[in-house]
């Protein structure tokens, strides 16, 4: 357990989570990547955890340690080749960009100071901590809630209903979250979602034993959880660019280490808190018996009442019987609070935190300043500045040329071995490449036309809306827009001035430390 949580999971999770912020600086692409990354981690795993596992596996696994270890071993082995795919087919563009311009090694102490003195990152890490408390305890308590409050032990259906019906929005959200985030902003949409989480938790907590009310509340709560689940990593990545603008160096590694430490540590803490609640409330674990007669004797000896008539229980895979016990009211109240009620409070607190996360508003200006600094540093070293996107195209072209040369050498060797005409086979290959390039060019042309048409429709729609205004309404609208722009410009100037002070201070500290070495 310690080897997995302390080392293996921490190393993998931190590195995997870093791929979103390091893949691109484009905030729009990064947001979309975050959504699809979370789709993979939430939806695909959800299909197994929410549907197949409780319905097909859990009733037959019981509480046998041998069976559980066997199942987990198979899952771990299946994960390995998939992790290799991620390793070989991903690219850290931001890291490569930094490597070409940043020569000063940033001390770990400076990164710690940068992260914990930045308001936006502190707010996001606080959100991560509080939301992880709620989600970890909820996840840990789900089996107990489905087994003892809403259903019976390993009935194979209660947990499926909770996950499928209550979690249906997680599937719908793929198509809704990103368009809404582009329209209203990632942080603003997340605040609204967290308020829905609190409302849904309250609805469920009112009647924790009523299946219909609980499913309604869970449906509302999961709608509210969509922005946080799908967009948090995109906002976290935006904050890394913000911090780079503010300090002159990236602290992604340390910030992500803190994030991973929170997530991993709270798994153990959540288990400890759950066990403390269960122990204090008088929880009685299920019993394992070799036969129903033995189970009946154990129940009679302790004065316990089974959840169902003993005749209804079926043997597990190892031939034993796992019997669920009726719990006390105190135990069921404790379980209901951890599964349903806790996120009422964590949702409200997190909404309050996110209300002050304004990293998106000036991100474009900050990224432009970062690029100007990189250009200046590059030219100061006597090098020719090449924009990252152009350099990426050049590197991609070189990689394709090298791959083509390798293919032709392999083709020639294969033709010599099989007695084929190399020139004929090469002409076939060249024709295939030409057709492929033409299709790709046509695809890009159509995508460009579609984007231009979409932008034109949006512009025409806005123009038509403004045209409907009376002269007085238009005057007020223009005045309101000018006032908003002036307010935003003034806020940016204040932030920029403060950021420049911190940037100069951080750079001076780095220069002093570099001089001492």
Q: What does each of the following model-derived ranges do?
A:
Residues 304, 309-329, 358-517:
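Intrinsic disorder in cytosolic terminal tails and internal cytosolic loops
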Residues 1-390, 412, 419:
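Membrane-embedded alpha-helical bundles of multi-pass transporters/translocases
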């Amino acid at each position: 357990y310690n080897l997995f949580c302390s080392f293996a999971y921490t190393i993998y999770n931190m590195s995997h989570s870093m791929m979103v912020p390091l893949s691109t600086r484009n905030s729009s692409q990064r947001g979309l990547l975050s959504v699809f990354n979370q789709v993979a981690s939430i939806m695909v795993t959800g299909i197994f955890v929410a549907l197949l596992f409780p319905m097909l596996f859990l009733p037959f696994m019981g509480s046998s340690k041998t069976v559980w270890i066997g199942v987990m071993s198979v899952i771990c082995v299946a994960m390995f080749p998939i992790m290799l795919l991620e390793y070989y087919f991903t690219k850290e563009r931001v890291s490569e960009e930094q490597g070409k311009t940043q020569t000063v090694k940033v001390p770990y102490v400076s990164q710690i100071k940068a992260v914990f003195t930045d308001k936006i990152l502190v707010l996001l890490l606080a959100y991560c901590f509080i939301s992880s408390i709620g989600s970890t305890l909820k996840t840990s308590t789900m089996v107990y809630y489905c087994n003892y409050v809403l259903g019976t032990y390993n009935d194979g259906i209660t947990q499926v209903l909770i996950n499928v019906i209550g979690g249906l929005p997680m599937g719908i959200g793929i198509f809704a979250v990103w368009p809404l985030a582009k329209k209203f902003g990632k942080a603003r949409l997340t605040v609204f979602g967290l308020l829905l989480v609190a409302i849904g938790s309250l609805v469920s907590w009112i009647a924790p034993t009523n299946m219909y009310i609980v499913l309604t509340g869970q449906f509302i709560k999961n709608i509210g959880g969509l922005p946080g689940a799908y967009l948090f990593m995109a906002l976290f990545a935006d904050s890394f660019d913000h911090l780079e603008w503010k300090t002159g160096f990236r602290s992604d590694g340390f910030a992500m280490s803190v994030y991973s430490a929170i997530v991993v540590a709270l798994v153990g803490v959540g288990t400890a808190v759950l066990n403390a609640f269960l122990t204090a409330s008088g929880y009685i674990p299920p019993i394992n018996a070799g036969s129903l007669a033995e189970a009946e004797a154990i129940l009679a000896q302790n004065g316990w009442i089974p959840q169902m008539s003993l005749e209804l229980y079926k043997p597990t895979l190892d031939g034993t019987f796992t019997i669920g016990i009726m719990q006390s009211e105190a135990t069921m109240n404790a379980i209901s609070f951890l599964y349903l009620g806790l996120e009422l409070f964590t949702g409200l607190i997190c909404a309050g935190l996110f209300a002050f996360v304004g990293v998106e508003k000036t991100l474009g200006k900050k990224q432009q300043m970062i690029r100007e600094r990189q250009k200046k540093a590059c030219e100061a070293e006597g090098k020719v500045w090449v924009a990252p996107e152009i350099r990426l195209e050049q590197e991609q072209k070189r990689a394709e040329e090298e791959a083509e040369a390798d293919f032709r050498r392999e083709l020639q060797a294969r033709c010599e071995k099989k007695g084929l005409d190399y020139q004929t086979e090469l002409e076939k290959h060249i024709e295939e490449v030409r057709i492929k390039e033409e299709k790709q060019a046509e695809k890009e042309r159509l995508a460009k036309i579609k984007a231009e048409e979409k932008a034109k429709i949006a512009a025409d729609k806005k123009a038509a809306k403004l045209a409907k205004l009376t002269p007085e309404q238009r005057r007020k609208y223009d005045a309101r827009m000018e006032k908003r722009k002036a307010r935003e410009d003034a806020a940016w100037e204040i932030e920029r001035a403060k950021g420049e002070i911190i940037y100069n201070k951080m750079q001076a500290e780095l220069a002093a430390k570099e001089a001492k070495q």
